[in-house]
Amino acid sequence: SAIDLRRLNEKFAGEHGFIAVASGQFVHSASGQPVRFWAVNGPSGEGRDGGDFRRTARLLAKYGVNLVRHHRAVFDKDGELNPESVRRIQAVVEAMKAEGIYTHLSIYFPLWFTPRADHPWLKGYDGKSHPFAALMFNPDFQAKYRGWWRALLTTPSETTGRRLLDEPAVFGVEVQNEDSFFFWTFDAKNIPDEQLRLIEKMFGDWLRRKYGSLDAAFAAWDGAKLNRDTPAEGRVAFRPLWNMFNEKTARDKDTVCFLFELQTRFYQETVAFLRGLGFKGLITASNWSTASPEVFGPLEKLSYTAGDFIDRHGYFECNHKGDNAAWSIRNGHTYSDRSALRFEAPDPAKPRQFVHPVMDPHYDNKPSMISETTFCRPNRYRSEAPLYYAVYGALQDSDAIVHFAFDGSRWGVKPNFWMQQWTLMTPAMMGQFPAAALIYRRGLVSPGQVLAEIKLNKADLLGLKGTPLPQDAALDELRLADVPRGVEVKPGQRIDPLIHYAGRVNVQFVDEAGSTKLADLTSFVDHAKRTVTSSTGEISLDYGTGVLRLNAPCAQGVSGALKAAGPVDLKDMHVNSSLELGHIVAVTLDDQPLATSRLLLLQVMTEERESNRQTEQVNPTVKRIVSIGTDPWQVRALEGTVRFKRADAAMLKVTALDFNGYAVGSVGNADEIRLQKNTLYYLISR
């Protein structure tokens, strides 16, 4: 198949040693060669034997995937080790390895666990509640948790006899998924009394070490007390997170300092435990957001520096509401069609919001990963996603983009018992992986200049002074007047988040005075015209219209509102289409520029929808689902013309390919390519 990218992967994962970190990048330890990961969360639960996994691995390699994040519990409903899960994970690693795909292991998520009322080592739960935060302070839980890792990493495979501990195809491990002391779930309503008493006693002990006594601590706080404060038992309670990051009292600062130290120590001790087992792969702490991106966000990231790289999660959602809308799409649900290329708010009737998961500052010269991300269904603009991630991931020199979720290896609208909003195996998503994976993995878009260097003083962060560049914090268009206009950032100002669409940002945590070195962004960002140009000159975004133009030597194209864009003249090609929403991109397959390449892929996509899906308009920006639809997927008929400018364009043969990348017939030459309504890929050769 002309779209088969298996050749990008190693002969087998680990061929060049374990994945390591050097100079802020992932590298092959044996060669020192940098590597980026275009990845998926998966495989799904459909595979029950090695053959299923091997077929899935071959499919993923074809579409440019070189890493899977296998997100699966290794424990049963009581928190005891499940040996079958260990065997399944081993089978996944072995199958992926054969196709040059690494595996990243994620085995604990609080939402997978609901301790029963009489649980022997997690007291106080009711069989319905999740143990948020408990892993970070409960020693019995930590001992059990470490037993899970010991069993998973040291049990020999029944197939190969190898331990995962010794397997270079294991990219790394994640300490915990989506939990933090600084997220809203850390609240007395979510933590039972028996567990609160444990951590309140720890806080009391911490305060005694700092102040000499609890009386002295309360005096330093002007005597303010909470109902749960019990000094006679050495216990001190916690104010709600909202109060901490808004009121920033002396008590709040002490509380945050204690929680930060406890969370960081948990990560440090877990890393030490895993290294003590002999684990040679990478370790990351967690990936969660916080109740305050401005105040708690940088502290969360600072706690993650105990690991080898910094991870995060982020979804581009679509105002989806209804019963169980957090994990399913059902009749009666409502949603909005929302364009990321226009920075539309979840409700597009509201002002633009300049926030997106692709925004990726690098912390402490460590690699970055986004281990869960997607544009959620049923948004018609979902087809913007693959090129958006690839282009801006490459511009910011992001190290790993892990799409959520590969929930089945068939092109089905409903892979499981319900229709979910993250399904990756769709024409608009996986169908655009060939060109997107090439752009990202091969660096066909150059990294941008470093436009901001931010030094955050650790003591200031613990003093709740925050950061001028909060990650995952929405800034609406009405606030753009408040961003710095030159190179000076005044206290309280936010750096323009559009900086991420122009170049790179580095953040360091320091002991010396904090500072911000900011480039003048006026040559890249034009708020009046609503445009952003990359510092490389290869990318331009017209966010007023919703059009992305890519003009790099080895990758050129246009994405978004093609009809509104009109004829688009790029360096080596000309594109014209009346599609309201479309994505047309050419990439070279021989590492030569478009101007001289002898082998190119032209990839075309518009929007997808399920057959028989029906909606009704609730208001101008909100729709209600009448019928979620059925198989098969449909793609809007494609339309347009692509002309290559090079002198030998008429000598370049153009072959239309089917959906699997196999030739179906000649369609002339590259002097003028009239797009066929049902063709997504064209091979251009000489």
What is the predicted function of each stretch?
Residues 1-15:
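Non-catalytic propeptide/linker segments at domain boundaries
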Residues 154, 263-283, 290-291, 298-317, ...:
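Catalytic-core region of carbohydrate-active enzymes that cleave or remodel glycosidic bonds
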Residues 159-161, 258, 270-273, 296-300, ...:
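Generic recognition of flexible, low-complexity loop/linker segments
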Residues 319-337, 616-624:
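Flexible internal linker/loop segments at domain or repeat junctions
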Residues 661-669:
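Surface-exposed loop/edge segments in extracytoplasmic proteins
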Residues 671-686:
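C-terminal beta-strand-rich structural cap/linker in extracellular carbohydrate-active enzymes
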